[in-house]
Amino acid sequence: MENEASVVQFQKVVGTRYVLTGERNTERFRKGYRSGFGEAICVIKPGTLLELWQVLKICVASDLVVIMQAANTGLTEGSTPNGHYDRGAVIISTLRIDTIHLLDNGKQVVCMPGSTLYDLENQLRPYERQPHSVLGSSCIGASVIGGVCNNSGGSLVERGPSYTELSVFAQITENGELQLVNNIGLELGSDPETILKSLDTTDLSSVNQQQTDKKASDNEYSKIVRDVDADTPARYNADQRCLHEASGCAGKLVVFAARLDTYPKNESEKVFYIGTNHLEDLTEIRRTILSEFNTLPVSGEYMHRDIIDITEKYGKDTVLMINMFGTQRLPTFFALKNAIDTRLNKIKIFSNITDKLLQQLAKLWPNILPNQLREYQNKYEHHLILKMHDEGIDEANKFLDHFFSDRTGDYFPCSENEGKIAELNRFAAAGAAIRYQKLYSKDVEDILALDFALRRNDRDWFEVLPADIDEKLIHKLYYGHFFCHVMHHDYVVKKGVDIETIKSEMLEILDERGAEYPAEHNVGHLYAAKPNLADFYKSIDPTNSLNPGIGKLSKSKHYADT
């Protein structure tokens, strides 16, 4: 009855149509993008920041667990409920609150909690500027604030994790009181209602900006990533340097708005495709470019031959779709696909039907990889997709020409189409592994996906697993952001193998190597938070009412059972 009363209150604030109840109506919000599932009384979809504040006040008064959710594209279950809680739980979906304000001709932006990277990219285009992340998460509708809350990384070498010290957020205090904090550096008023009404209705480009030395991006990262002799990783989720209020909060605060730097578009860019059978070649390329070039790469993506093979076959439809229609249709496509899967997967004969259909359709299409990429795929085990910009293009051309003059590896400057397809093939890699799992579910127990950061001075970066682990795997799929030494490993595990056991063995190996994990997907409910990260979560959410249980911490009120 108490929960029913709360639902009625929510309906009065946001309207009946924006409060979803019942298992079927709420399932797609309670189920994670890759994995994860939990209970929720309802899903609430406020349309303004003031409505969000009013909903939060009801939640606090009713002692409810709150799961904040935007695009629900998290890969480690941190965007959804996790099983059962000791209190009732609600999901607050912020996608209706998607306003973006441009400051100083687009040099900075203020983003509301439902704004997406795709929309931000579009709004910045006339100003010849870019958001923190491009091509990748933006293609599946990821939110700007979700990236900030999880210190999301990405492929762009110069930018580091998504970070800001300028935000407006709500916090539940030790005494269980809800308070609003305005640290965004804009004069918006003094009380919560006035501040939020200002954010909801005011043109922020005309609002007085307070003098502040607070950062709106990780502007130190380019120096950090260049230090190739440091014995620590360049970036990872538990890095104390990037845990500040909204940044890294992982839903333990309710973020109403964040102020972020944007980046000028490069005048020119060029992709170089590198292939080799010798790991030390890529090691020397990375160390030389980072430490000696005047211009840092735009990106440098590593792919092992095995993941290229898998992606060419099982990620082909994704590459085709983006190549033909662009990225703008992908969020709608994925939303439609997920809605169909949610309904049909309950019927055994229709399980994974959309993946099976898409796979068959892709087979009818001719090979999409350009000939020279295919030649390198057959010839070389290790591949690097290096994108340089402006003066760095000439630097890379001269260096690579000299570097491979006496080595068996090789490189070539890509045409526009070759570079585009190479990058799209890398983007499709993670989805290709999941497609493989769904098509061969009788043989596959699960995909164990690990993202981790190696030390910057690691020369022995390629993994060789012990035989007793290797024999439990169908495929080992290796790719990553090579210059940042952030690696993504997808292990296709044989049927019948205990996933938690093999994961524990893998993490022990990473510990021995001095790696940090996760690097950029955050702990969610799949990784244990390191002590400093756990302390950060507890300090900003002392009652454990917001996203309880992440980092494998207690789900109980006040962390009672830890």
Model-derived regions, located:
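Glycine-/small-residue-rich beta-strand-loop submotif within the FAD-binding core of flavoenzymes
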Residues: P81-T116, S155-R159, E177-L178, L260-P264
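A conserved active-site cap/scaffold subdomain adjacent to cofactor or substrate pockets
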Residues: K265-S299, D306-D309, K313-Q360, L369-F403
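Glycine-rich N-terminal segment of FAD-binding domains in flavoprotein oxidoreductases
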Residues: E23-T26, R30-I97, C111, P131-V134
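Conserved glycine-rich FAD pyrophosphate-binding loop
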Residues: Y33-S35, E39-I41, L64, Q69-A71, ...
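General beta-strand structural signal in soluble alpha/beta enzymes
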Residues: V19-E23, K45-P46, V66-A70, E77, ...
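Short, structural beta-strand-to-alpha-helix junction motif
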Residues: T48, T73, K107-Q108, S115-L120, ...
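Short, conserved secondary-structure transition motifs
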Residues: A142-C149, E301-D317, E423-N425, N522-D535
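FAD-binding subdomain of flavoenzyme oxidoreductases
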Residues: R125-E280
